[in-house]
Amino acid sequence: MQVSVLITLAVLGVMFVWTSAAELEERGSDQPAWLKSLERIFQSEERDCRALYGGCTKDEDCCKHLACRRTLPTYCAWDLTFP
């Protein structure tokens, strides 16, 4: 039974690589389709600044009067300044 499971997984892996190569050739692109779709998802969610409690890596990621708190998880919080 273990051998048949391994053979099945190997066949599925080969089929995945084969279909990915066929799709890549069909589109004429240098990136796999799944990578392009992930790239589109992340690009659509980019904003000029992060709102309150939004994820950040540095203070510039956050909107005005917010600062990046470096406790895990990092988030944008009020920097105690007034407009």
Swiss-Prot record:
Expressed by the venom gland. Residues 22-47 form a propeptide. Residues 1-21 form the signal peptide. Pfam families: Toxin_12. InterPro entries: Huwentoxin-1. GO terms for cellular component: extracellular region. It is found in: Secreted. Its main location: secreted. Keywords: Disulfide bond, Ion channel impairing toxin, Knottin, Secreted, Signal, Toxin. Probable ion channel inhibitor. Belongs to the neurotoxin 10 (Hwtx-1) family. 40 (Jztx-35) subfamily. This is U20-theraphotoxin-Cg1a 2. It comes from Chilobrachys guangxiensis.
